[in-house]
Structure formats: structure tokens, C-alpha cells
Amino acid sequence: QLTFTSSWG
């Protein structure tokens, strides 16, 4: 899930 947040950030 952290990877998804990084993609948005």
C-alpha cells in the first residue's frame, strides 16, 4: 500500500 501512496505523492 505504501507503494501506492508514493505513486500519488
From Swiss-Prot:
GO-annotated biological processes: flight behavior; neuropeptide signaling pathway
GO CC terms: extracellular region
Bilayer-spanning residue ranges: none
InterPro entries given in the database record: Adipokinetic_hormone_CS
Residue numbers of Pyrrolidone carboxylic acid PTMs: Q1
Disulfide bonds, paired cysteine numbers: none
Entry GO MF terms: hormone activity
Positions of modified residues (Glycine amide): G9
Subcellular location: Secreted
Keywords attached to this entry: Amidation, Flight, Hormone, Neuropeptide, Pyrrolidone carboxylic acid, Secreted
Secreted in keyword set: yes
Predominant subcellular localization, coarse grouping: secreted
Purpose: This hormone, released from cells in the corpora cardiaca, causes release of diglycerides from the fat body and stimulation of muscles to use these diglycerides as an energy source during energy-demanding processes.
Family: Belongs to the AKH/HRTH/RPCH family.
Protein known as: Adipokinetic hormone
